[in-house]
């Protein structure tokens, strides 16, 4: 399927079109976890659109799926979103060859762009090794590429976790259009990234508290992917409003809304502590907060991080504190909203 841009036009296209907030979308499964739940996935795409987000990032690496299932998941997301919002895909498969196959699949089914990183087991031997492998993958596709520095074994090259001398070189690759700063990294890394390559590509810090600096001072125009649906609903799209107000220069109004969300940010804080050291980003806490605010929910296959009761209670308490009512019943989350409406329930086993 034809892209909206040519490879040589990708940077110019992104500057004009990548604006607003991007959120991740995770796979949904049938209650027995045997198949993808296409209706549930489409429900989430439509709920993301109703919230006012401008892009959805399909995250097929977040749980156990075959490679063909991952491709099918991407195809469903792209098809449902087509012509309404941008679609991206987190491309961090097991091998470079799989990454290239996924990039070609995204281009074939009509995805907008790709967020390209490396699998958590990737072990570069040198700084040049990182660059050459990355360029090799970018050269294989016409897709616009967002460079993702997270989850790499690169602290041995620089204490910022990524060798800064590579940023301008990667930004010079023709179809690299943006860089995503890893969530939870130092603000110094964000400033360094803007200073080194924002004259060539977009720089994207997904952390909301930093937007009050990065938008007015550095010109950030697009943020994510982040689970911003965990703090808003279509009726009260507060995260979208914060970013839009900052883009308009109305910082005081944006700050007022930001402080309204303080209790939710405090309640959700620390949910990532149990999995950051593994390199595996669990889908369950994000799927749970999305379900609480109207998403499909549904549990996912192993391997994935555990969703503890205390985490769910922190999410629900945070939502109540900012005037939102978490969805009930809890059983609906585990089988998925669409399946629950069809009569699906958790199985009970008796000896």
Write out the residue ranges for each language-model feature:
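Active-site beta->alpha loop and helix N-cap motifs at the rims of alpha/beta catalytic domains
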Residues: 2-161, 303-306, 325-350
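General structural feature for long, well-ordered alpha-helical segments within catalytic domains
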Residues: 40, 44, 69, 73, ...
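Structured C-terminal cap/extension of enzyme domains
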Residues: 213-351
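A short, hydrophobic/aromatic-rich structural module that often spans a beta strand
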Residues: 4-7, 109, 171, 190-206, ...
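Generic structural signal for residues positioned in beta-strands
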Residues: 20-22, 202, 285
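Residue-level recognition of short, well-ordered coil/turn positions
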Residues: 52-53, 111, 175, 250-251, ...
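Catalytic alpha/beta core domains of metabolic enzymes, predominantly
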Residues: 136-144, 149-271, 275
């Amino acid at each position: 399927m034809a892209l909206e841009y040519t490879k040589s036009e990708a940077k110019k296209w992104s500057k004009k079109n990548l604006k607003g907030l991007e959120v991740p979308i995770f796979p949904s499964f049938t209650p027995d976890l045997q198949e993808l739940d296409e209706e549930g996935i489409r429900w989430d795409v439509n709920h993301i659109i109703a919230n006012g987000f401008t892009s959805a990032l399909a995250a097929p690496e977040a749980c156990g799926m075959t490679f063909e299932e991952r491709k099918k998941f991407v195809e469903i997301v792209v098809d449902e979103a087509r012509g309404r919002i941008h679609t991206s895909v987190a491309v961090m498969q097991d091998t470079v060859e799989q990454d290239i196959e996924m990039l070609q699949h995204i281009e074939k089914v009509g995805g907008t762009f790709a967020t390209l990183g490396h699998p958590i087991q990737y072990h570069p031997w040198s700084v040049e090794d990182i660059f050459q492998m990355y360029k090799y993958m970018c050269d294989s596709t016409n897709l616009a590429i967002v460079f993702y520095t997270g989850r790499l074994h690169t602290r041995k090259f620089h204490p910022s976790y990524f060798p800064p001398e590579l940023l301008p070189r990667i930004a010079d690759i023709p179809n690299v259009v943006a860089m995503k700063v890893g969530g939870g990294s130092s603000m110094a890394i964000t400033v360094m990234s803007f200073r080194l390559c924002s004259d060539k590509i977009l720089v994207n810090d997904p952390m909301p508290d930093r937007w009050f600096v990065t938008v007015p001072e550095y010109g950030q125009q697009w943020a994510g992917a982040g689970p911003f649906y965990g703090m808003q609903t279509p009726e009260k799209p507060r995260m979208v409003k914060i970013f839009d107000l900052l883009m308009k220069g109305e910082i005081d109004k944006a700050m007022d809304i930001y402080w309204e969300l303080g209790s939710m940010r405090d309640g959700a804080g620390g949910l990532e502590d149990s999995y950051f050291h593994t390199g595996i980003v669990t889908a369950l806490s994000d799927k749970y907060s999305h379900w609480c605010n109207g998403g499909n929910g549904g549990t996912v296959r192993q391997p994935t991080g555990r969703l503890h009761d205390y985490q769910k209670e922190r999410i629900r308490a945070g939502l109540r504190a900012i005037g939102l009512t978490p969805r009930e019943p809890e059983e609906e989350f585990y089988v998925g909203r669409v399946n629950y409406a069809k009569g699906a329930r958790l199985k009970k086993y008796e000896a």
